[in-house]
């Protein structure tokens, strides 16, 4: 297991109370040895005007996952901040849920890179994101 902080899924989800994460319906669903996953509904909260999943909602899911994964790689007195987010959208989603899967690409002392892949309910890749974070403290 790579994580330096040991939080349960309930504890992870509690961090979202009264935030945009909760408003979008993002819920952490899996914490593995080197992976963090979350689901987000595709509904009126996350649609763009034409009834499809908004690219910004996919980006919000990615940044949520990468930032929390980055935080779990820090020690007491440290935090992470996002420095760059890149998203490539592959296919539209109009309903149901999407699942984000976050894994590390680089874990340095001062910066991290995370890959977050967003899948639809059929397991098809809908969006590929990369988040860079800086470790502070």
Curated annotation (Swiss-Prot):
Its main location: cytoplasm. The active site is at 63 (nucleophile or proton acceptor). GO terms for molecular function: 1,4-dihydroxy-2-naphthoyl-CoA thioesterase activity; acyl-CoA hydrolase activity; hydrolase activity, acting on ester bonds; identical protein binding; thiolester hydrolase activity. It is an enzyme of class 3 (hydrolase). Changing residue 48 to N: 290-fold decrease in activity toward salicylyl-CoA. Changing residue 64 to S: 13-fold decrease in activity toward salicylyl-CoA. One of its GO terms (cellular component) is cytosol. GO terms for biological process: enterobactin biosynthetic process. Pathway: Siderophore biosynthesis; enterobactin biosynthesis. Changing residue 68 to V: 47-fold increase in catalytic efficiency toward 1,4-dihydroxy-2-naphthoyl-CoA and 10-fold increase in catalytic efficiency toward lauroyl-CoA. Does not affect catalytic efficiency toward benzoyl-CoA. Keywords: Cytoplasm, Hydrolase. InterPro entries: HotDog_dom_sf (IPR029069), PAAI_dom (IPR003736), Thioesterase_EntH (IPR026576), Thioestr_dom (IPR006683). Its EC number is 3.1.2.-. Induction: Induced by iron starvation. Required for optimal enterobactin synthesis. Acts as a proofreading enzyme that prevents EntB misacylation by hydrolyzing the thioester bound existing between EntB and wrongly charged molecules. Displays esterase activity toward a wide range of substrates, including acyl-CoAs and aryl-CoAs. Homotetramer. Dimer of dimers. Interacts specifically with the aryl carrier protein (ArCP) domain of EntB. This is Proofreading thioesterase EntH. It comes from Escherichia coli (strain K12). The gene is entH.
